[in-house]
Amino acid sequence: MSALYDNEAKIRQAVGMLQKIVNDTSVPRNIRRAATDAIRNLQDQTLSPAVRAANAIGILEEISQDPNMPMHTRIAIWNVVSMLETVKD
């Protein structure tokens, strides 16, 4: 049960970090949209935490190579991906 709580805490923290990206108007719209999609995946309670994290990682890794992304946003996305990679069932 403790692992599930830890996973949910990591997911909540990742959602919070992604929410900052979504609310940052200096970030291009397509990147904010991808962050919103990742949040939506992370909040889908019908899936296990690891599957939700993997889905979000896929979205974020795809967008992380965008040349228009500000450097601070890229670093934030890498931090979120690193955190989500530790989520396991």
Curated annotation (Swiss-Prot):
InterPro entries: Ta0600-like_sf, UPF0147. Transmembrane segments: none annotated. Pfam families: UPF0147. It comes from the Archaea. Belongs to the UPF0147 family. HAMAP family: UPF0147 (MF_00342). This is UPF0147 protein Saci_0891. It comes from Sulfolobus acidocaldarius (strain ATCC 33909 / DSM 639 / JCM 8929 / NBRC 15157 / NCIMB 11770).
